[in-house]
Amino acid sequence: MELKFDDAKLFSYTNSEIFEYISSLPSLPDYGAIVPLSHKYLAKAYATWDEVEDAVSAMKFASQLGIHVPHVHRIVVHDRDFYCIMDRIPGTALDVAWHELGWLSSLRLAFQLRRVVHRLRSAMSTSAGSLPKGRCESYYLEDWFQLPDRATNHHVNAFLNFWASFPGLPREVKKTPAEHATCPRPIFSHNRSFVFTHHDLAPRNMILDPEGQLRIVDWDLAGFYPESFEYAGMHNFLTRGWTRFARWRWNLFSWIAGGLYDKELRWLETIRSRFTHFGAGRRCNMRAGGYASATRWPDNLISD
């Protein structure tokens, strides 16, 4: 017999009963961590409690800024897995709807999102990272050693400048202590407060509801980062199958919504590519106590 989740029993079901629904019902296509329980609720899986805290804190904070976000009604713990039971937003994901939209509709939605982004950016911080712990989970800041929690402008600039000027491992290991002490050609010199950033405004994470309003989902990576990270994050997806006009519309859409940071985007993509291929590239600089030596790992792990 097919299981049917009873919305009225959301708070009376035991964790085990809800897990039975989660394990029995089909997940969303291409989103194995998300299981629709009913037309009203869905369950999203998380691997750690820290991930749950990051996501829930970000959604609560965004809601306090006046942004419509999915409400988390319950957190289910089963063995070592965690599930947030939250609102299922009605509508069509923007990556599906995008191909049917014209220029005028795209512009209208771009200005909608612009208002959301401005509201997010009204919240500022002198340190980077997620709300609960200040953990820098940005995919532009995740080499092997990562940054310390609540990283400062100095830490973030040093990290980005190190990878922007990374000469390759053979040359890096030959640097002198004096060469490790300063960045020869700094590209990044961010000196303003970090702003609250969704950090994954790809079209798959925006729902066009029946009233024509954009609803933002998937706040897992949200935190305080440089302004350019929001714009860059809007290009962090594959446009496979998109026509040239669809890509042009998205470029205009992201510029209106997030501001124009094409130079920063190109550098961030270069930086990400470099530390993806040379994840331990900062080790020599760290051993020398260089300008980019800040990490959240203990010293003994760096010296091993």
Describe the residue ranges of each PLM region.
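Active-site Asp-x-Gly
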Residues: 191, 195-196, 209-264
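Short, glycine/acidic-enriched loop or turn micro-motifs at the edges of active sites
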Residues: 90, 203, 221
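ATP-binding pocket architecture of kinase catalytic cores
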Residues: 23-146
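Helical subdomain adjoining the active site within ATP-dependent kinase catalytic cores
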Residues: 146, 168, 175, 238-304
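An alpha-helical support segment within catalytic cores of ATP-dependent transferases
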Residues: 106, 119-199
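Residues immediately flanking
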Residues: 88, 199, 219
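Catalytic-loop signature of eukaryotic-like protein kinases
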Residues: 200, 204-206
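Juxta-kinase regulatory segment immediately upstream of eukaryotic protein kinase catalytic domains
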Residues: 1-23
